[in-house]
């Protein structure tokens, strides 16, 4: 009884820890991070749907191979068959894969359309990739802008995550539709946050866009996902989702800092 109690407690702790850190990659993780946006929820369901189809195909083909090897080996069939084709079988193995592909294509195109069609945004954020950090601009809020650089091991605090946390996070309100306008200044980067279901290339001279909407407060981590130089692995992305009130307070504090900076420049001149 005591042993079972410990086992149940251990399982509970593992599940709880997985829930707490659902917005980041975990050691020995299998599968996707838990979805945190509408697009990722659809991708998650589509992935599971494809897994069922793929498993059925693998089991069917493997079973067919075993059946053929047993039933049609040289011992059971000393005289081999002489026919060269079978029209019915050829029609079947052509039509069935087409049907399977159509079944896969319909939800796939629906998800692509949902991801590509940007809804009316409550907030727009410009994202610019540099070697090797991100620069963010909030054009709807007096052009708040700041660099976001990975926190080095020397400056890392106990509650911060190595190779994931940054000095300045993107901050967005919960349940808000956020549009990202993404480009780069030097080489090609890729703006990717797995739990939010987007991975968009940042290309110099070109603006790509995507969107998200997150209902749950927390911090969601990503990485640059396009090889962009020696420090490619040190370009994390951190998106903090807060309440509308906290977001307004954050905007006010950023604008205040910017205003104080401008006043300091004027006083110096």
Swiss-Prot record:
Membrane topology annotation: Multi-pass membrane protein
Gene Ontology MF term list: copper ion binding; cytochrome-c oxidase activity
Pfam families from the UniProt entry: COX2, COX2_TM
Cofactor: Cu cation; heme
Organism of provenance: Rickettsia bellii (strain RML369-C)
UniProt-recorded name of the protein: Probable cytochrome c oxidase subunit 2
Keyword Transport attributed: yes
Cell location: Cell membrane
Biological processes annotated in GO: ATP synthesis coupled electron transport
GO cellular component, one term: plasma membrane
InterPro entries in alphabetical order: CcO_II, CcO_II-like_C, CcO_II_C, Copper_CuA, Cupredoxin, Cyt_c_oxidase_su2, Cyt_c_oxidase_su2_TM_dom, Cyt_c_oxidase_su2_TM_sf
Keyword presence, Heme: yes
Keywords from the named record: Cell membrane, Copper, Electron transport, Heme, Iron, Membrane, Metal-binding, Respiratory chain, Translocase, Transmembrane, Transmembrane helix, Transport
NCBIfam families for this protein: CoxB
């Amino acid at each position: 009884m005591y042993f079972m109690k410990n086992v149940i407690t251990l399982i509970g702790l593992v599940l709880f820890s997985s829930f707490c850190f659902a917005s980041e990659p975990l050691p020995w993780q299998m599968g996707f991070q838990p979805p945190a946006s509408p697009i990722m929820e659809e991708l998650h369901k589509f992935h599971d749907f494809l897994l069922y189809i793929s498993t059925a195909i693998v089991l069917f083909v493997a079973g067919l191979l075993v059946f053929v090897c047993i039933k049609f080996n040289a011992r059971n069939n000393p005289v081999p068959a002489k026919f060269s084709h079978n029209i019915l079988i050829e029609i079947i193995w052509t039509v069935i894969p087409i049907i399977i592909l159509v079944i896969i294509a319909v939800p796939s195109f629906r998800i692509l359309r949902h991801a590509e069609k940007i809804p009316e945004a409550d907030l727009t954020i410009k994202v610019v990739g540099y070697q090797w950090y991100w620069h963010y601009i909030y054009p709807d809020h007096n052009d708040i802008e700041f660099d976001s650089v990975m926190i080095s091991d020397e400056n890392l605090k106990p509650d911060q995550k190595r190779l994931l946390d940054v000095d300045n996070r993107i901050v967005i309100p919960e349940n808000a539709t956020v549009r990202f306008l993404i480009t780069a200044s030097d080489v090609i980067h890729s703006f990717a946050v797995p739990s939010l279901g987007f991975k968009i290339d940042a290309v110099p001279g070109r603006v790509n866009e995507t969107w998200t909407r997150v209902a749950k407060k927390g911090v969601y981590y990503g990485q640059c996902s396009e090889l962009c130089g020696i420090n490619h692995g040190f370009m994390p992305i951190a998106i903090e989702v807060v309440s509308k009130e906290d977001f307004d307070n954050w905007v006010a504090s950023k604008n205040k800092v910017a205003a104080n900076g401008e006043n300091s420049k004027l006083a110096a001149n």
